[in-house]
Design a protein with these regions (language model features):
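Short amphipathic alpha-helical segments
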Residues: 3, 63, 104-108
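Anionic N-terminal interaction surfaces
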Residues: 1-43
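Canonical phosphoinositide-binding patch of PH/PH-like domains
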Residues: 92-111
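Membrane-topology and secretion signals of cell-surface/extracellular proteins
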Residues: 3-14, 51, 76-77, 88, ...
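IQ-motif-like calmodulin-binding regions
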Residues: 116-117
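Phosphoinositide-binding peripheral membrane targeting modules
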Residues: 31-40, 44-86
Length: 118
């Protein structure tokens, strides 16, 4: 099993994402509650789940669930940006603009885009 497949399976087993394996670590500029930093993102059904990535092997703490059905203004950086430093993507939900950077899994962004477009 390849590393990405193992990672996807671990994330599914932990409940972070569904069978599509759309999960990754990223840096968030700011969440509505003022928190920021490293987070673990997962797409489960039509929701984006945001977990605290505390890096201390503690149980995952769900920080926020964002229904992707109401997301607007989704955008991502170009392929060249991804090659150099990882994707940045942003969107607006309930009047707040979320911005994530250092994302290195195109498959995650593909699933996210599919759910937003439903």
């Amino acid at each position: 099993m390849a590393n990405q497949e193992k990672y996807a399976q671990q994330m599914q087993d932990a409940g972070v994402c569904d069978a599509r394996g759309a999960a990754l670590c990223a840096t968030v500029k700011e969440l509505p509650d003022g928190s920021f930093g490293m987070v673990l993102l997962g797409v489960k059904g039509n929701d984006l789940l945001i977990y605290d990535a505390n890096m201390k092997s503690e149980p995952l703490k769900l920080m926020r669930t964002i229904p992707l059905k109401g997301v607007t203004d989704f955008s991502t950086t170009s392929l060249m940006g991804e090659i150099l430093k990882g994707y940045t993507f942003r969107f607006t939900s309930d009047g707040f603009t979320y911005s994530f950077k250092n994302c290195r899994r195109q498959a995650f962004l593909d699933v996210l885009q599919q759910e937003i477009n439903k």
